[in-house]
Design a protein with these regions (language model features):
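Bacterial N-terminal signal peptides that target proteins for export
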Residues: 2-14
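N-terminal signal peptide c-region/cleavage motif recognized by signal peptidases
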Residues: 23-25
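Extracytoplasmic/periplasmic copper-protein system
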Residues: 39, 142-184
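Short, solvent-exposed loop/turn segments enriched in Ser/Thr/Gly
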Residues: 40-45, 120, 134-136
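Low-complexity, serine/threonine/proline/glycine-rich extracellular segments that form mucin-like
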Residues: 42-80
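Extracellular adhesion/glycan-binding regions together with long Ser/Thr-
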Residues: 88-116
């Protein structure tokens, strides 16, 4: 008689969600693992890179930090080097009791190799704006043979699915009881 809950069948059922997740990550664009975060929070952004450029290995990832995001810090990766570039802010901001006139605008991991058939994560910590809305993080993926610019942002009437090379999107959730753009 066939046992529907045999150990072998249970193991296959247990592994199915993991296999589906890996398959989705491998075929996806560069996206944040957590696609939403509260306004004004410190957010650990994990960018998932699911493939290289047209079959070649990834050699560098550069992320542009959008205006309104403060104090971005990259997490080091074994075998990769880091480059952090700052730029002047359009409007100075207060941060930890200091007036900041510049902030981090790009994070770059380079010098490592991520095979096209593998996936990996590139992690950063940042403070999100106090207001809700969508933020777009353009990513330049440099590979052994070519580059991919994940920089497209949806126009009115478009969705991210309409884009060939979308920037990584993060939805910043407005505080409960506050309308977007309204502050006290």
């Amino acid at each position: 008689m066939h046992d529907p809950l045999s150990p072998r069948r249970l193991a296959r059922l247990w592994l199915l969600p993991a296999a589906l997740t890996m398959s989705a990550a491998a075929s996806a664009h560069i996206v944040f693992e957590q696609k939403q975060a509260p306004a004004g929070s410190y957010y650990k952004g994990t960018l998932m890179v699911g493939h290289g450029c047209n079959g070649s290995a990834t050699r560098a990832i550069t992320v542009t930090i959008p205006e309104g995001v403060q104090g971005a810090h990259p997490q080091p990766k074994a075998g990769w080097q880091l480059e952090v570039k700052r730029a002047s802010l359009a409007k100075p901001v207060q941060s930890h009791g200091k007036l900041m006139t510049d902030d981090v605008r790009t994070l770059r991991w380079f010098g490592g190799t991520l095979a096209d058939a593998h996936f990996d994560e590139f992690v950063m910590l940042m403070k999100l704006p106090e207001q809700g809305g969508k933020l777009y993080f353009p990513v330049l993926q440099e590979c052994e043979n070519g580059t991919t610019e994940w920089t497209q942002v949806p126009a009115d009437g478009q969705t991210m699915r309409d884009l060939k090379s979308p920037a990584a999107e993060l939805e910043v959730l407005a505080p409960a009881g506050h309308m977007q753009g309204h502050s006290h």
